[in-house]
């Protein structure tokens, strides 16, 4: 599929270049969602009404059956052959890749983001464009705006129609679209890009998730702490984040007294300060800390996407301070925490990655091969003890240590990291925070930190749940669990209110629909709004108020249960 998308991207470049020889191309990308192409033109102002005309031009190019050759060239040659594309060359040179993919058709050269390609234009016979809009060059709002064209190409119409059905399903599962129904969160430019505002319904969901995860943390021996959202710049210099992570942090805040502060992008340094609050002995360990931590990370404005990519997020963070002889036990324990929580939310691991450092990349990773060898071996041994299959991913470690990434395949076939276990010998070192403990022999030894991410941030996790469930959240998690609907307001409304009092007394989230509408319309409206339970009150229910007639979301048939058994449906995990 990617080879057809990549070839379609090439063919679009050819068509646009023919229509405007002076066109300038910018960023372009190909993935399993299709391709996008950024361009700048004085004459081509493409809008959705032009898509059919563009598709006809592509069909003619397909019929011309032009052979395509692909070659890999070094940067010097790429700069020569693409000399009329300054924006594209700026991106290529900044990427610092040693080689560049160039396609050649009829002695014209075109850049392509990947090497997968079909060898003739006649092989791509079906095209579609999803959207056209604006995009800042390099995703930076201070740069010029280019036109971004999104589309895809396939070998025939049948394959494309199948793909279009998948695209429609993606739209239905988009958490931003679902949010318009459930009203969980909002954004406002006055609050700032990427700064989510949780609405009442969203705060209910967020709090329920937190309460459950906190109960599991407590069961496994974690102690909650609370630390500031700001830290002195020296704290992040000491931890190493300032040197390795500065581009992803918000700028420094200069205070009147001369101190420089920064919004924290993570809590690890603060939790080290908790450990250092007093001397620790061998019997104090392991010390397991947890915190719902508000973090700020500077994401490029072009990359902000609903709750998936934000600048302010709350991480359910965990750090385990332990001895060397406790590492394996604590990793096994951390895995049990993850397994229990993820299972409750009906998620399954698609793949487990052992993320390792790249020994050839001294800038992105701490330069201490002995530390890397030790920590990577420890994590791999733990995975083997658990009997888990895993894939090694070189270059995907955190800058300070290796990690185990638990990947979930979403309903839209996206692979996302939900949970992580990271082993850290760097922050505890003498050069950093000097995390030590007194041994039985009254000597001091260096401790170890295990970073544990159970579900990541509330923001991304809620986005994942909405996508997985299509907004039909589990009954215990739904912000509005049930609605009571009278068959006739004048006759049955009082009975609805009496049942409402009983259910509210059981701490259930229930409302009465007293609108002056037809019964079928009320039922349909609450189905659209994904209310898990609809309770119908008519003459029979008034005669027997302890017998509940209800219908579950997505079901046509009604059910009946006695009130006490009905309430058990709402039980929390």
Swiss-Prot record:
UniProt keyword annotations, A-Z: Aminoacyl-tRNA synthetase, ATP-binding, Cytoplasm, Ligase, Metal-binding, Nucleotide-binding, Protein biosynthesis, RNA-binding, tRNA-binding, Zinc
Single GO term (MF): ATP binding
Enzyme class: ligase
InterPro entries reported in the protein's UniProt record: aa-tRNA-synt_IIb (IPR002314), aa-tRNA-synth_II (IPR006195), aa-tRNA-synth_II/BPL/LPL (IPR045864), Anticodon-bd (IPR004154), Anticodon-bd_dom_sf (IPR036621), Thr-tRNA-ligase_IIa (IPR002320), Thr/Ala-tRNA-synth_IIc_edit (IPR018163), ThrRS_anticodon (IPR047246)
GO BP field: threonyl-tRNA aminoacylation
Pfam family, one: tRNA-synt_2b
Catalytic activity reported: tRNA(Thr) + L-threonine + ATP = L-threonyl-tRNA(Thr) + AMP + diphosphate + H(+)
The protein's required cofactors: Zn(2+)
Keyword Ubl conjugation set for record: no
The protein's Enzyme Commission number: 6.1.1.3
Any single GO CC term annotated in Swiss-Prot or TrEMBL for this entry: cytoplasm
Coiled coil, from the record: none
Cofactor note: Binds 1 zinc ion per subunit.
Primary subcellular site in the record, as a coarse category: cytoplasm
Positions with a binding annotation for Zn(2+): 268, 319, 451
Family matches, as NCBIfam families: thrS (TIGR00418)
Free-text function comment from the UniProt entry: Catalyzes the attachment of threonine to tRNA(Thr) in a two-step reaction: L-threonine is first activated by ATP to form Thr-AMP and then transferred to the acceptor end of tRNA(Thr). Also edits incorrectly charged L-seryl-tRNA(Thr).
HAMAP family for this protein: Thr_tRNA_synth (MF_00184)
Family: Belongs to the class-II aminoacyl-tRNA synthetase family.
Name of the protein this chain belongs to: Threonine--tRNA ligase
Species whose genome carries this gene: Mycoplasmoides gallisepticum (strain R(low / passage 15 / clone 2))
Classification of source organism: Bacteria, Bacillati, Mycoplasmatota, Mycoplasmoidales, Mycoplasmoidaceae
């Amino acid at each position: 599929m990617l080879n057809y998308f990549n070839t379609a991207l090439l063919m679009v470049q050819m068509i646009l270049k023919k229509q405007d020889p002076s066109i300038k191309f910018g960023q372009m990308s190909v993935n399993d969602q299709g391709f996008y192409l950024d361009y700048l033109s004085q004459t081509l102002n493409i809008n959705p009404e032009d898509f059919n005309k563009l598709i006809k031009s592509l069909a003619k190019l397909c019929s011309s059956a032009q052979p395509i050759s692909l070659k890999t060239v070094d940067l010097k040659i790429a700069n020569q052959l693409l000399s009329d594309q300054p924006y594209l060359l700026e991106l290529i040179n900044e990427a610092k890749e040693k080689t560049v993919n160039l396609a050649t058709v009829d002695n014209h050269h075109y850049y392509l983001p990947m090497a997968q390609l079909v060898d003739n234009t006649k092989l791509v016979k079906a095209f579609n464009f999803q959207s056209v809009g604006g995009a800042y060059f390099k995703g930076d709002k201070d740069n010029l705006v280019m036109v971004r064209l999104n589309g895809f190409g396939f070998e025939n119409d049948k394959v494309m129609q199948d793909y279009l059905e998948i695209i429609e399903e993606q739209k239905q599962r988009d958490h931003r679209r679902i949010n318009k129904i459930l009203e969980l969160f909002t954004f406002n430019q006055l609050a700032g890009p990427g700064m989510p505002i949780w609405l009442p319904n969203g705060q209910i969901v967020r709090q329920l998730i937190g309460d459950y995860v906190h109960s599991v943390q407590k069961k496994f021996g974690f102690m909650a702490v609370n630390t500031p959202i700001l830290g002195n710049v020296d704290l992040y210099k000491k931890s190493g984040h300032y040197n390795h992570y500065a581009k992803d942090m918000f700028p420094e805040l200069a205070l009147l007294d001369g101190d420089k502060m920064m919004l924290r992008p993570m809590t690890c340094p603060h939790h080290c300060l908790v450990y250092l609050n007093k001397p620790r002995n061998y019997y104090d360990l392991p010390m397991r800390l947890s915190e719902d931590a508000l973090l700020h990370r500077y994401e490029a404005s072009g990359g902000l996407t609903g709750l998936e990519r934000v600048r302010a997020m709350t991480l359910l963070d965990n750090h385990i301070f332990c001895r060397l002889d406790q590492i394996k036990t604590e990793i096994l324990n951390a895995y049990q925490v993850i397994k229990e929580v993820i299972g409750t939310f009906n998620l399954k691991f698609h793949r487990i990655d052992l993320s390792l450092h790249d020994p050839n990349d001294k800038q992105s990773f701490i330069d201490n091969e002995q530390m890397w060898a030790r920590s990577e071996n420890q994590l791999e041994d733990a995975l083997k003890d658990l009997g888990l299959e895993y894939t090694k991913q070189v270059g995907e470690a955190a800058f300070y240590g290796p990690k185990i990434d638990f990947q979930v395949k979403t309903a839209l076939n996206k692979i996302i990291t939900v949970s992580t276990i990271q082993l850290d010998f760097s922050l505890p070192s003498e050069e950093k925070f000097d995390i030590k403990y007194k041994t039985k022999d009254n000597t001091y030894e260096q401790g170890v930190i295990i970073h544990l991410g159970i579900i990541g941030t509330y923001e991304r996790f809620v986005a994942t749940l909405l996508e997985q469930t299509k907004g039909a959240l589990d009954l215990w998690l739904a912000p509005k669990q049930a609605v009571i609907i009278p068959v006739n307001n004048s006759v049955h409304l009082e009975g609805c209110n009496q049942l409402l009092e009983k259910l509210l007394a059981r701490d259930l989230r229930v409302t009465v629909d007293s609108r002056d509408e037809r019964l079928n319309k009320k039922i349909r409206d609450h189905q659209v709004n994904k209310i898990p339970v609809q309770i119908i009150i008519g003459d029979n229910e008034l005669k027997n108020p302890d017998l509940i007639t209800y219908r579950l979301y997505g079901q046509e048939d009604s059910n009946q249960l006695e009130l006490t058994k009905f309430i058990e449906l709402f039980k929390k995990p």
